[in-house]
């Protein structure tokens, strides 16, 4: 069944443009509240958000919907996505909501939903919500005496800070480390520097002055250049770049080099395997992860299980097959011993623990493998189905034949933006570049002809 509202990470779009309108947000509140209004106890929902200007609008619309459906609402304010997942469980809420478009610009926003167990909702539940959204939603409203209440909750941000601190092994402190952190002017602008400082680090912070429109603006995990500059300026030992809702992380080593999610997963998997705490015999990643990671793990006797793109699918595979490390090249790192979704700060602490215990530099710890040449380009689309065009299909088949057994090709529509992503990797960088450029040209032509 086709999905009408939900993408790979909730509902997302440009603010005040369908589907990111106050009307739909209120309807989502009613629909979700109706589905989770089970049993005779008083039902509750927790709502967090990042620092986007439109967060105020969507927050109030969701509150109207949930209270109209008979749920009490706890408003957490600006707080990371993994904190919402954690507090949904901790506060025994029926549902958790994060208002965020993650790494997207401020003009976008989104609604992510978590079940009472702290995990993102299944495809089946999202389809059930979509079905309700297209019906007479107002027939589901609570009786007058059962309308919910809403209140702002103070102090839960500190509960999350304490949770994060407990994920660092007790025999490790961060004393002696100078850490530069970029909070992307987003949800972690308070919690991340506080947690690192309380663990003993000297902390230099950028991207911690949100104004509603500067989230992810030339900062954060998708724009690490500002962090690289600051790291050199203050001679930090490590740089940590979070995204707008802090569920992904990118590291910058002491030389100013980028360490992506694939390398971070390699570090954690290698460390946990040595400690006999790695489960599943390997890790879970998506089709976008580098072939070099797969080869590195294979040399260690570990496996790489691949899923389609989206951390929710990584988590689903982890749960079904008893893995405890998974993630994405983009920096979503899921460590199920600690949480139910990607947590940039928790992942960074695992790397810092390895650095402190080994006495090595960040570059020595984090350069686990040589990435296979990989190139990713995006083709923006406004409609049509260029991937069903016969000429495009033939070009894809030719590209796969050219790579043969020496590389991989991944072509997929983005689940969060109107893009088609074209990725190829292989040992021959010139061949990879030609394949990607040729395919981008063919898809662009098919798009124009549609």
From Swiss-Prot:
SUPFAM superfamilies: Phosphoglucomutase, C-terminal domain (SSF55957), Phosphoglucomutase, first 3 domains (SSF53738)
NCBIfam families the UniProt entry points to: glmM (TIGR01455), PRK10887.1 (NF008139)
Classification via PANTHER family: PHOSPHOGLUCOMUTASE (ALPHA-D-GLUCOSE-1,6-BISPHOSPHATE-DEPENDENT), PHOSPHOHEXOSE MUTASE
Disulphide linkage map: none
Family, per entry: Belongs to the phosphohexose mutase family.
Post-translational modification Phosphoserine, affected residues: 102
Active-site residues, as the UniProt record annotates them: 102
UniProt PTM: Activated by phosphorylation.
UniProt name for this protein: Phosphoglucosamine mutase
Molecular functions (GO terms): magnesium ion binding; phosphoglucosamine mutase activity; phosphomannomutase activity
Necessary cofactors: Mg(2+)
GO biological process: carbohydrate metabolic process; peptidoglycan biosynthetic process; UDP-N-acetylglucosamine biosynthetic process
Cofactor detail note: Binds 1 Mg(2+) ion per subunit.
Binding, Mg(2+): 102, 243, 245, 247
Role this protein plays: Catalyzes the conversion of glucosamine-6-phosphate to glucosamine-1-phosphate.
Catalysed reactions, as listed in the record: alpha-D-glucosamine 1-phosphate = D-glucosamine 6-phosphate
Any single Gene Ontology cellular-component annotation: cytosol
Keyword flag Cell inner membrane: no
Primary gene name: glmM
Known EC number: 5.4.2.10
Phosphoprotein among keywords: yes
Stored InterPro entries: A-D-PHexomutase_a/b/a-I, A-D-PHexomutase_a/b/a-I/II/III, A-D-PHexomutase_a/b/a-II, A-D-PHexomutase_a/b/a-III, A-D-PHexomutase_C, A-D-PHexomutase_C_sf, A-D-PHexomutase_CS, Alpha-D-phosphohexomutase_SF
Signal sequence annotation: none
